[in-house]
């Protein structure tokens, strides 16, 4: 547990602190880590100044000190001033001073968002069901209410229980100027707890961009994703931790996620037609003309409203009576909303059209890639997987009738040994083009 740093301290002079330090037999102050700690904890400039921020996982200076600075995070300039201050005590070992800073910071750790949430007191007025209509003109219905509640509770749980499973993205869909990004920025309470800097998931520094943030906006990222990148986005959302180094540390370590992800888009067809399901993405249409107020009309009032929004969500969280998923009754509404925003599946249409005219008994994914989709190159694994999803989902939904996956691999003259699909009832044509293979050949 962190030590409280708000206790009243008796101001001590440099001479007072020197009396507290261990010394050699000749009276010279020992240059030990413990003496450094004693100075950091009792010097009137440095006492209570150094704390470990559990959100950013960086060391902060949280009070006014005797030099000009901006921001809270400890930086190189701060270190120079601290070293100079330590010289008043005859201590100049930078390595030991740095070690002492880490120890003192760790013993005085804090979490700014937890402190914020735990300090809220709800006034009893329900706002979760109303907020998206109030600021953004969303429908005021049960679906919108559940979508907002799931997102808020997921965000709370992520900071109170870092690394918890939460892979849902609330996606606001509407034209420019509605205030979608501004809503998420103000929802994050402080600007430093919000980020819209996540542009690419293959960036080597992508995980550092999560550090210290609570709500991260992914603007138009889903709308511009192809079949391969949407799988990467889904995999990224499902992660519960990252492994990387933070400043001042030598070794990489697991970092449990404390953030949630929000989507914003102007496109009505932003969702890919994902055969494996789009359960991670919760679309909510918004319309500025239907909003009661614009969120920036009176920013102070909007921020007060949002404080009470979080207070209401904390009351629900503390009750334990919630789930981070749609109720069974709302699952159909979710799927209906997702259908409204799905892209036209051109590949599925081309494959369906090909099968209508196709007279063979069997077909494989590589054949469909070449003959139905008109490609001449060798397909990547994700491309054949997408074709398999089109076929298997189409068969299970009844969109593709008269076909079933064959149980064993077959040899296709142009495409080698492949798993694929066969007609349930053969039209008595094309069977001579394929041959059964043995189990040994299929391996």
Tell me what each language-model feature is:
Residues 1-127, 142, 146, 377-382, ...:
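N-terminal nucleic-acid engagement/recognition segments and initiation subdomains in replication
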Residues 5, 14-17, 39, 45, ...:
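Extended aliphatic helical segments
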Residues 45, 49-54, 58-61, 66, ...:
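Residue-level preference for alpha-helix termini and adjacent loops
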Residues 79-83, 134-138, 179-185, 199-200, ...:
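Generic detector of short, locally flexible boundary/turn motifs and exposed helical patches
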Residues 88-111, 165, 192-196, 202-237, ...:
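Feature primarily recognizes SF3-like P-loop helicase cores of small DNA viruses
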Residues 101-211, 366, 373:
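P-loop NTPase catalytic core of nucleic-acid-dependent motor ATPases
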């Amino acid at each position: 547990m962190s030590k409280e740093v708000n206790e009243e301290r008796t101001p001590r002079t440099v001479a007072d602190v020197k009396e507290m330090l261990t010394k050699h037999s000749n009276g010279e102050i020992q240059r030990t880590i413990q003496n450094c700690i004693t100075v950091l904890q009792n010097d009137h400039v440095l006492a209570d100044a150094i704390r470990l921020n559990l959100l950013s996982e960086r060391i902060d200076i949280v009070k006014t000190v005797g030099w000009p600075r901006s921001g809270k995070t400890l930086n190189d300039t701060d270190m120079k001033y601290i070293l100079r201050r330590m010289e008043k005590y005859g201590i100049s070992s930078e390595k030991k001073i740095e070690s002492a800073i880490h120890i003192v910071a760790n013993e005085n750790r804090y979490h700014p968002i937890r402190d914020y949430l735990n300090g809220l007191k709800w006034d009893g007025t329900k706002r979760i069901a109303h907020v998206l209509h109030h600021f953004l003109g969303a429908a005021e219905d049960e679906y919108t209410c559940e979508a907002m509640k799931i997102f808020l509770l997921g965000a709370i749980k992520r900071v109170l229980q870092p690394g918890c499973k939460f892979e849902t993205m609330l996606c606001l869909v509407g034209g420019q100027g509605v205030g979608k990004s501004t809503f998420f920025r103000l929802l994050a309470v402080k600007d430093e707890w919000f980020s819209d800097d996540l542009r690419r998931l293959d960036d080597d520094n992508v995980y550092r961009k999560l550090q210290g943030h609570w709500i991260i906006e992914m603007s138009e990222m889903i709308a511009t994703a192809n079949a391969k990148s949407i799988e990467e986005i889904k995999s990224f959302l499902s992660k519960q931790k990252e492994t990387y180094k933070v400043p001042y540390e030598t070794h990489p370590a697991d970092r449990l996620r404390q953030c949630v992800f929000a989507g914003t888009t102007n496109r009505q067809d932003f969702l890919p037609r994902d055969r494996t399901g789009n359960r991670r993405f919760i679309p909510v249409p918004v319309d500025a003309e239907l909003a009661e107020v614009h969120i920036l009309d009176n920013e102070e009032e909007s921020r007060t409203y949002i404080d009470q929004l979080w207070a209401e969500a904390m009351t629900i969280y503390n009750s334990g009576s919630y789930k981070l998923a749609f109720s069974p009754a709302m699952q159909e509404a979710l799927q209906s909303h997702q259908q409204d925003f799905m892209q036209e599946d051109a590949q599925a249409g081309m494959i369906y059209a090909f099968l209508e005219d196709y007279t063979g008994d069997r077909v494989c994914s590589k054949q469909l890639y070449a003959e139905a989709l008109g490609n001449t190159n060798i397909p990547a694994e994700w491309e054949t997987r997408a074709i398999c999803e089109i076929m298997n989902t189409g068969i299970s939904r009844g969109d593709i009738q008269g076909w079933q996956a064959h149980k064993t691999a077959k040899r296709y003259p142009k495409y080698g040994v492949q798993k694929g699909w066969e007609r349930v009832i053969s039209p008595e044509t094309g069977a001579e083009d394929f041959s059964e293979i043995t189990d040994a050949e299929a391996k």
